[in-house]
């Protein structure tokens, strides 16, 4: 079989039997939609940066805390996600408000900005601000590129 737009390019012994089948009919134009980039776009209004994370299908609201060495999730949030903290390891934590007793548990998976992390040890402790479920610390943030675009009023969190 030989396809060409120039009959002279067909070898001479085969030209007499060549059949003009015409040009193919172009199909419909289908716009190519690029896949969404990995990561999360977060509205930014100049205040604390908040991000959604998922544990066991339950969405949690976490404050991005570049000053926190470890990720902390509240008792209530872990209970909503079905995480048993009774076998956790007792630890002492030190924060801006002083020292406190806490617990470390391992969560099987944390979905964040298109990335699946885990198992992941997290600190379990209460927070004064009950409108958030925890603090996203550097132990997790180190696996992401965080970019704040104040002029565009958004931040991005992209897995590295």
Give the ranges of each region predicted by the language model.
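Pepsin/retropepsin-fold aspartyl endopeptidases
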Residues: 1-160
């Amino acid at each position: 079989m030989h396809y060409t737009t120039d009959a002279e390019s067909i070898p001479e012994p085969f030209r007499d039997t060549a059949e003009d089948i015409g040009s193919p009919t172009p199909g419909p134009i289908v716009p190519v939609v690029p896949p969404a980039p990995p990561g999360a776009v977060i509205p930014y209004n100049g205040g604390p940066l908040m991000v959604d994370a998922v544990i066991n299908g339950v969405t949690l609201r976490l404050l991005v805390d570049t000053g926190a060495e470890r990720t902390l999730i509240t008792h209530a949030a872990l209970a909503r996600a079905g995480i048993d903290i009774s076998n956790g390891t007792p630890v002492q934590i030190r924060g801006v408000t002083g020292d406190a007793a806490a617990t470390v548990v391992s969560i099987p998976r944390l979905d964040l900005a298109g990335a699946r992390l885990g198992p992941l040890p997290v600190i379990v402790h209460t927070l004064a601000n009950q409108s958030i479920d925890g603090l996203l610390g550097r132990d997790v943030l180190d696996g992401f590129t965080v970019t704040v675009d104040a002029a565009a009023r958004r931040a991005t969190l992209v897995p590295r």
